[in-house]
UniProtKB/Swiss-Prot annotation:
The keyword Methyltransferase applies. Belongs to the methyltransferase superfamily. RsmH family. This is Ribosomal RNA small subunit methyltransferase H. It catalyses: cytidine(1402) in 16S rRNA + S-adenosyl-L-methionine = N(4)-methylcytidine(1402) in 16S rRNA + S-adenosyl-L-homocysteine + H(+). The gene is rsmH. It comes from Cyanothece sp. (strain PCC 7425 / ATCC 29141).
Length: 294
């Protein structure tokens, strides 16, 4: 898909696309909620696969929403757009035949250096998905205590050397750029061969903390089943164990849901070859029970 000319970098290659379409059990004329529309890739698939269907498209990222508006313009009034964190969305009287959430940071966000999500290019330490919020990664790094930073790195990044990194940050701050932080983290860790960049877990942890991703996910998993019609499907794609654990338990423990996937659906080797960022994707599905059954 080619997004808007204004946002050419917001390319959205939908992961697990066929599994999502089959899992949502699409029907002509159905109404679907894309809770994380991104560049519009999954929404386009839904609109193409289900004639006369409608999509309500959410994203907290204004740039993503602009790209989705452009990409989905041919579908006209079949799509309605709202800038919102999926945890805060109010469905009102609307009930959906299916809901999709594609979690975490998008490839487009990682590929926009000025957003500060990636350590691969120097940029301000921002990491806000919603530019309307005030808290940035720089503010968190420069104001949190060593104990608070260590907890963030350990619980949100599963970083073994969380305390060591946190102490080093406090000793050398203020830090304002991604390059400064990545360099400091690399120097703080013992030299050893690693399969990932030394700063990977720290950047993930800060992004999750700045955007309250896990708290938002838990709220979404609790609230979204109430937005489904009886028999409606909820599909959630996660990309790391912290997300997947919450999705697994959230679907299993909700009184209104019946889990449809004992184990998560994974991308094929062909999809991973075509889109390497799909390699860690996991799809879980559940179906809304009748209110009396729940």
């Amino acid at each position: 898909m080619i997004p808007s000319e204004l946002e050419p970098e917001f390319l959205h290659i939908p992961v697990l696309s066929q599994a999502v379409i089959q899992g949502l059990n699409l029907r002509p004329g159905g109404h679907y909620l894309d809770a994380t529309v991104g560049g519009g890739g999954h929404s386009r698939l839904i609109l193409e696969a289900a004639p006369e269907s409608q999509v309500t498209a959410l994203d907290r990222d204004q740039q993503a929403l602009q790209a989705a508006r452009s990409a989905l313009q041919p579908y006209g009034e079949r799509v309605q757009f709202y800038q919102s964190n999926f945890a805060d969305y109010e469905s009102g009287s609307l009930r959906f035949d299916g809901i999709l959430a594609d979690l975490g940071v998008s490839s487009a966000q990682l590929d926009q250096p000025q957003r500060g999500f990636s350590f691969r290019a120097d940029a301000p330490l921002d990491m806000r998905m919603d530019q309307r919020q005030s808290l940035t990664a720089a503010e968190l790094v420069n104001t949190a205590s060593a104990e608070e930073l260590a907890d963030i790195f350990y619980y949100y990044g599963e970083e073994r050397f969380a305390r060591r990194i946190a102490r080093r940050i406090v000793q050398h701050r203020p830090l304002y750029t991604t390059a400064q932080l990545a360099s400091l983290v690399s120097r703080a860790l013992p030299s050893r061969s690693q399969s990932i960049h030394p700063a990977t877990r720290v950047f993930q942890a800060l992004r999750i903390a700045v955007n309250r991703e896990l708290e938002s996910l838990e709220q979404f998993l609790e609230r979204s089943p109430h937005w489904l019609v009886t028999g409606g499907r909820l599909a959630v794609i996660s990309f790391h164990s912290l997300e997947d654990r919450r999705v697994k338990h959230g679907l299993r423990d909700h009184s209104l849901l019946q889990v449809l996937t004992k184990k998560p659906i994974l991308p094929s080797s062909e999809e991973i070859s075509a889109n390497p960022r799909a390699r860690s994707a996991k799809l879980r599905l559940a179906q809304r029970l009748d209110a009396l059954e729940g």
